[in-house]
Amino acid sequence: LDKQSCENVALDVQKDSGNCDILVNGAGGNNPKATTDKEYFEVGDIDADTKSFFDLDSDGVSFVFNLNFLGTLIPTQAFAKQMVGREGCNVLNISSMNAFTPLTKIPAYSGAKAAISNFTEWLAVHFSKVGIRVNAIAPGFFVTKQNESLLFNSDGTKTQRTEKILAATPMGRFGKAEELEGALLFLLN
């Protein structure tokens, strides 16, 4: 994500629609190079043909942090300039429950979303005197095109990973996007 390009987009939006009052930062995603093959490390994994913590690719980890964290920081820098000193302006960041209770196998994603949660708290204090309210939501697990093949077999049955995730989910099911609407509207009002 290029800061200058994002600032140009912010200026174009401002010209077309006026000042930005609401910014929702929804950047998110993972990279296979930033995941482990197994949930738990075992002594023999160092020499095995298994991708472990020790094999995480720094480029993959950087990709995940750039996508999630810089994908929140840079748009906020670009659009929040228009909010300074005005009333009723809001920044809403999308974090994840992984920030608080990390799933196994996805250390970079969990770490990047933890960075979003921490950054949101910092930014809320930082902007508190200039009329910009900053919050985040941290949804649980949702099925998306990006993760569908990890959660369901080709015949539509649940994978072992899905069974484990749902066993640790109080409602025993994945979330639905429309269930976030009330929280979003409340935080942006």
Regions of interest found by a model, annotated:
Residues S96:
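Residue(s) in the substrate-gating loop at a strand-loop-helix junction
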Residues P102-S110, W122, L150:
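Active-site loop-to-helix junction immediately N-terminal to the catalytic Tyr of the SDR YXXXK motif
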Residues D21, S117, F127-V143:
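Conserved Rossmann-fold SDR core element
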